[in-house]
Amino acid sequence: HEFAMAGARFPAYSSIVGGGANGCVLHYVENSAELKAGDLVLIDAGCELQHYAADITRTFPVDGRFTAEQKAVYDVVLQAQLAAIDACKVGNHWNEPHQTTVEIITEGLLDLGILRGDYSELVETGAYRDFYMHRAGHWLGMDVHDVGDYKVHDEWRVLEPGMVLTVEPGIYISPDNHLVDPCWRGIGIRIEDDVLIKAKGPVIMSADAPKTTMDIEALMADK
């Protein structure tokens, strides 16, 4: 309905709406579980307008307020996303935004006690992959995962003006992960924006969607 009211005829893909631990499932499409107070709900959705796709993710607290643990994880993801967007500059290569998210998420998980060990070793061994198991983004255009190489002659492709990509880091703590404190289990958070590369710097085309915890709580309190 919201897509149609805004002038779009079709969704760009099947929406992902994962409440509670279902937010830890990357492509959860059943979208049928009851939302419960105290849970988060992860919404990954976008419409197709004039043959171009959008792909946006936000994570909301079901009852309008983040718990302390949810906010702590959310803020790590947001810090990683903002830094990755800053890395979406002409002349940087495709992997730089992703590597930025890896470094910040690893440091954040260490600070929260979810990961333990030496920071450099954890990054090198990919220990973060238990909680962040996907790339930071993909090309976006007339298809959600649009065509285009990520490497050319085995070298990461350099970002150029006019390119559009998603930036979507996340942290997903399985409810079955008994290596972490129970207070963290079942938290799944992703924040995704659509970014246009321009000579003067990245443009966030989905910037109107609130994404700080303060703005999200204010939005929900206003409904």
Predicted regions and their residues:
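Active-site neighborhoods and metal-handling regions in enzymes and metal-associated proteins
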Residues: 1-223
